[in-house]
């Protein structure tokens, strides 16, 4: 990606020579990166992807659990380390925030949590943590509590830190998600957090979904690797992965 960022276009043979791998390996990698929206595969090579991908469909939680696990683990571990004793934390429903529960450590018992994630609440309770679950309607495919009752409950809280997922991140559309009701809950919770963090792997960048729940400037981003430096000019970005 660094070669492509520098030259804007690159051939399969150039990449094979530079990376000392076969052209068939390069072609497979380019196909995968094209599907992730990180570049545009063309005949004989690839070009940089400067445009946003506009998407509407949302995968269910079981499908998401199997995607980008390495990246989610890096992000979750970094995010969990930001939680300190006596924090009052909001955890948004989502697979990356769920990964955080593996790394809460010895401070978990002294922290109070509010989450709209059913799986999150059950796991935190099993760990002996103090956890509150807002009322509302259960969205089956994401296991998230949504609706006006959830928003009303969350509006009473003042969180020290909040950790949120996002389906898409764009410099123009901000942080976005496919569902209006889920977006409203995210927005309400985010506005009641002193510190706000969006947890998103690098595949989420340059993607736009129907509903924006916050602008780029409203939250810091924790990702595995930043695909474009322009985001760091708009907000704080923390990279949990290693640059290659």
Q: What positions do the PLM features span?
A:
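Conserved phosphate- and dinucleotide-binding cores of soluble alpha/beta proteins
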Residues: 2, 9-15, 20-22, 41, ...
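HTH-adjacent hinge/linker in prokaryotic transcriptional regulators
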Residues: 2-13, 18, 24, 28-90, ...
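Gly/Ser/Thr-rich loops at beta-strand to alpha-helix junctions
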Residues: 95-98
